[in-house]
Design a protein with these regions (language model features):
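Rossmann-like NAD(P)-binding element
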Residues: 64-125, 130-133
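Conserved small/polar residues in nucleotide/adenosyl-binding loops
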Residues: 144-146
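Short, hinge-like loop/turn segments at secondary-structure boundaries
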Residues: 46-50, 90, 141-142
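N-terminal glycine-rich dinucleotide-binding loop that anchors FAD/FMN and/or NAD(P) in oxidoreductases
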Residues: 46-71
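Hydrophobic packing residues within well-ordered alpha-helices of enzyme cores
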Residues: 41, 56, 134-142
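NAD(P)+-binding Rossmann beta1-loop-alpha1 motif at the extreme N-terminus of oxidoreductases
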Residues: 1-46
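Phosphate-coordinating loops and pocket residues in cytosolic domains that bind phosphorylated ligands
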Residues: 42-43, 50, 83
């Protein structure tokens, strides 16, 4: 597997540890809509402690990774995802009082990926969804701009 550049969409309790681990071997761009969270992560601080500050700092890059350069760069600018060829969507799918999932974050992430997706790129949905949601709703949103 050569020329891998990963994007992890959603830097929460699933996305951040995943991004950190992949960044030990591959170039990774971590994306989150929460600018304050991204700023803290880029300073090497994870308030949730999903990843220790020491482990986080060990993989952080001050800029987008170059081809073949292992490390993690975090951003809230979706344009900086352009050039990645593997996208892992790890956004929350919270449920309401009636136990119905709120798929808004998933739809938004699918649209974000779709704007930078290239032919042959791979999208992996890590978020928990009901059967059929990925194929019927997320994929069409991702492909709308190709």
């Amino acid at each position: 597997m050569e020329n891998i550049k990963l994007a992890v969409i959603g830097l929460g309790y699933v996305g951040l540890p995943l991004a950190r681990l992949f960044a030990t071997r591959y170039p990774v761009v971590g994306y989150d809509v929460k600018r304050e969270r991204v700023a803290a992560l880029m300073e090497g601080r994870d308030a949730t402690q999903e990843v220790s500050d020491e482990l986080l700092r060990s993989v952080l890059l001050p800029r987008l990774p170059e081809e073949g350069e292992a490390g993690l760069f975090c951003t809230s600018d979706a344009e900086q995802l352009r050039g990645c060829n593997y996208y892992i969507v790890a956004v929350p799918t919270p449920v309401d009082l009636h136990h119905s999932p709120d798929l808004t974050p998933l739809y938004s992430a699918s649209e974000t990926v779709g704007k930078v997706l290239g032919r042959g790129d791979i999208v992996i949905y890590e978020s928990t969804v009901c059967p059929g949601i990925t194929e019927d709703e997320c994929v069409p949103l991702s492909l709308i701009h190709i």
